[in-house]
Amino acid sequence: MSELLHTLTRESLAQYFDHTQLAASATEADIEALCRESLENRFKMVAINPVQVPLCSRLLHGSGVHVGAAVGFPLGQNTIEEKVFSAGQSIENGAQEIDYVINITALKSKDYAYLEREMAALVAVCREQGAICKVIFENCYLTGDEKRAMCEIALAVGPDFVKTSTGFGSGGATLDDVRLMKRQVGDKIKVKAAGGIRTLDSALQMIEAGAERIGSSASVKILGEFCRLRQE
């Protein structure tokens, strides 16, 4: 088990987590439970779809737990204007963070100028309203060169985070991808790992590889595992 098991506290580990509920079948009760769990465990953020932002904003107001909206999710196949509108509306409704999916078609077509315009537009709407911007690559569909190209665009534009995955693609976060992204962006941009992170060991490995945020729907389970091991 990682050395982090002994250096992290319950509180510091909890702050890595964006506690996630993005299922199309999620009920209002599910969203309320997500917020309640995040308050109880002091997670950094709840990750939800834009339609859930007003409810989460009301439930979490003044708590310090951020509300994060997923934009262009999960396919990224929206126009720049649609993504900007969704991000702006989500922020107006109370979101403090935006996780948006890139246009993967543009990347596969090597239309880097489009991707830079898209990223700049999303970063701008977030900056204007004081929100954090995270860029989801969806690495399971990308080659190494494509991942590196997106990191270079991010370095030019300056979002707050680059993120591995939606959790809805054919694969989630991998240690190799987190390491690649961290090598490319260094300390200038943070890395978020998401997708398939369901155990404490997996989460700690992602943190050791360079992730500064973890997106997971298993955050409560992971934190509970940490607490049990620290007591043994």
Model-inferred region functions:
Residues 194:
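Short hydrophobic "strand-cap" motifs at the C-terminus of beta-strands
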Residues 2-41, 45, 53-58, 62-73, ...:
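Alpha/beta enzyme core
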